[in-house]
């Protein structure tokens, strides 16, 4: 089984509805959803602010390629058009980190891969408060491998420029889970 940390964001149209479409599209795979944050756009493109959240999901039959295909399918379903890098989008679904679990062992191992279409963990996640703040909100023990070393997400945030953190503002918006099965623990280390 794999557990994935997904960063979802939108800054076109009904931003909350696009985020909700991603959560709904993942269905019972969803383990946890962070609060929704209003965030300053990342990159040099002038555009509307984003709504961002983090979703943690389990996929008994999923590997990293299957998660990537699922993320791209969610984006296509939202009418995502790939244009300008870091430009506006209806829905952005990024794989941040993926963990492989085995029935024979306790805990999980972070998947590290560098392929032409997928690098895990996400190579810029540690630089993005709009990823780390929501992730920390749903998993206070979260760790991310950076430069070959596991680092606590709270520590990465503490080391970030204050202006980067200040660009991530908690909203009163919420994403709803449609769950037909019981909730599971969030931290992959506790499975």
UniProtKB/Swiss-Prot annotation:
Q: Which family does it belong to?
A: Belongs to the HPPK family.
The major lineage groups are:
Bacteria, Bacillati, Actinomycetota, Actinomycetes, Mycobacteriales
Name the UniProt record assigns to this protein: 2-amino-4-hydroxy-6-hydroxymethyldihydropteridine pyrophosphokinase
- Show the PANTHER family listed in the entry: 2-AMINO-4-HYDROXY-6-HYDROXYMETHYLDIHYDROPTERIDINE PYROPHOSPHOKINASE
Q: What class of enzyme is it?
A: transferase
Which organism encodes this protein? Mycobacterium leprae (strain TN)
Name the gene. folK
This entry's Gene Ontology molecular function terms read: 2-amino-4-hydroxy-6-hydroxymethyldihydropteridine diphosphokinase activity; ATP binding; kinase activity
* Gene3D superfamilies assigned to the protein according to its UniProt record, in alphabetical order: 7,8-Dihydro-6-hydroxymethylpterin-pyrophosphokinase HPPK
Q: What is its EC number?
A: 2.7.6.3
Keywords of the record, alphabetical order, are:
ATP-binding, Folate biosynthesis, Kinase, Nucleotide-binding, Transferase
UniProt KW Zinc keyword: no
Entry annotated with the keyword Lyase: no
The role this protein plays is: Catalyzes the transfer of pyrophosphate from adenosine triphosphate (ATP) to 6-hydroxymethyl-7,8-dihydropterin, an enzymatic step in folate biosynthesis pathway.
Q: Which Pfam families match?
A: HPPK
């Amino acid at each position: 089984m794999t557990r994935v940390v997904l960063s979802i964001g939108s800054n076109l149209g009904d931003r909350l509805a696009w985020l909700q479409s991603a959560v709904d599209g993942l269905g019972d795979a969803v383990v946890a959803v962070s609060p929704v944050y209003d965030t300053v756009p990342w990159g040099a493109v002038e555009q509307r602010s984003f709504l961002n959240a983090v979703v943690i999901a389990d996929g008994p039959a999923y590997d990293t390629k299957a998660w990537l295909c699922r993320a791209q399918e969610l984006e296509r379903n939202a009418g995502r058009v790939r244009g300008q890098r870091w430009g506006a989008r209806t829905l952005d679904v990024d794989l941040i980190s993926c963990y492989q679990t085995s029935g024979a062992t306790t805990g999980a191992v972070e998947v590290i891969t560098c392929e032409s279409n997928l690098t895990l963990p996400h190579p810029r996640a540690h630089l993005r408060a709009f990823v780390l703040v929501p992730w920390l909100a749903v998993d206070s023990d979260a760790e991310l491998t950076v430069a070959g070393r596991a680092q606590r997400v709270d520590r990465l945030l503490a080391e970030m420029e204050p202006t980067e953190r200040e660009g991530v503002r908690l909203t009163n918006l919420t994403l709803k889970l449609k769950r037909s099965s019981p909730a599971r623990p969030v931290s992959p280390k506790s499975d």
